Curated annotation (Swiss-Prot):
This is NAD-dependent protein deacetylase Sirt6. NAD-dependent histone deacylase that acts as a regulator of life span. Binds 1 zinc ion per subunit. The active site is at H133. Belongs to the sirtuin family. Class IV subfamily. GO terms for biological process: chromatin organization; determination of adult lifespan; negative regulation of heterochromatin formation; negative regulation of transcription by RNA polymerase II. It is found in: Nucleus; Chromosome.
């Protein structure tokens, strides 16, 4: 289904480096590096995860730039030989491990480039998530700008009209938006990133003691540069990816292994139990529409904390 998403985007030539070879650390090295990562997480007060397409491949959704990625094969005139529909896909071990790490207090925020909706399906609360490129399960009102969860993947990408009325009158708060029309909120190449998601992503990346990139080559900007925001303040940066990334030379630690394997080991070392996916916690399986908007109050509250942090770092140290 990521093939259909890619096909729905406008033509664009600069897709970055495609098909770079993957490398794998030995089991012994992976174990040592996971121990090091677990220690870094323990010592950090603010951990931010940056997730890319590589965390969803074990759900049957192809990535884009891997050896068998959508765009890599597209260049050869081919299609991936596996391509689960978005509606069939279920959150991976990584998605569920992220839930556990947040609930146990080890991770404070997640910034995702993925549009597949698997963070949403996993039950991750919106207050912990920035979705920089949109979400195939979200409908956004053109008038009131509120976002709502769709029970199935929306029909379009590129912020096109879904020809449906705003769902605000159907939500639990009973607020109504007259004459609002819903659009998909999946970005095309020329679109600006969603303001609140980007602002929260920038702030969390900057104040992080530890930024961890999971399953991404970090080629798309500005998303791929966010994990570097904390380096000038002495923060740490870890990469878990099978291919080389744009910022390997700046990382404190690089783990070349499947993300599912890494987070399973890290959770075990931290004494964190990874839950199974449950439809009861999946907003796409609920009977009533659920709102998915980032409240402006959340952005303003964290912005005040961010300003204090920046003032302390740049003026008092």
């Amino acid at each position: 289904m990521s093939c259909n998403y890619a096909d729905g985007l406008s033509a664009y030539d600069n897709k970055g480096i495609l098909g770079a070879p993957e490398s794998f650390d030995s089991d012994e090295v992976v174990a040592e590096k996971c121990q090091e990562l677990a220690e870094l997480i323990k010592k950090s007060g603010h951990v931010v995860l940056h997730t890319g397409a590589g965390i969803s491949t074990s759900a049957g959704i192809p990535d884009f730039r891997g050896p068998k990625g959508v765009w890599t094969l597209e260049e050869k005139g081919e299609k991936p030989d596996f391509n689960v529909s978005f509606d069939e896909a279920r959150p991976t071990k990584t998605h569920m491990a992220i839930i556990a790490l947040i609930e146990s207090g080890y991770v404070q925020y997640v910034i995702s480039q993925n549009i597949d909706g698997l963070h949403l399906k996993s039950g991750l609360d919106r207050k912990y998530l920035s979705e920089l490129h949109g979400n195939i399960y979200i409908e956004q009102c053109k008038k009131c700008r509120r976002q709502f969860v769709s029970p199935s993947a929306v029909e379009t990408v590129g912020q096109k009209s879904l020809q449906r009325a705003c769902k605000s009158s159907m939500d639990s708060k009973g607020r109504s938006c007259r004459s609002g029309i819903l659009y998909d909120n999946v970005l095309d190449w020329e679109h600006d990133l969603p303001e609140n998601d980007l602002e929260m992503g920038v702030m969390h990346s900057t104040v992080a003691d530890l930024n961890i990139a999971l399953g991404t080559t970090l080629q798309i900007v500005p998303s791929g540069d966010l994990p570097l925001k904390n380096l000038k303040c002495g923060g740490k940066f870890v990469i878990c990816n099978l291919q080389p990334t744009k910022h390997d030379k700046k990382a404190n630690l690089i783990i070349s292994s499947y993300v599912d394997v890494v987070l399973s080991k890290v959770c075990k070392l931290l004494g964190v139990e990874i839950p199974e996916y449950s439809e009861a916690s999946d907003p796409t399986k609920q009977s009533k529409p659920m709102e998915w908007t980032i409240p402006t109050s959340n952005v303003n509250t964290f912005h005040r904390q961010y300003k204090k942090y920046v003032y302390f770092i740049y003026y008092l140290l």
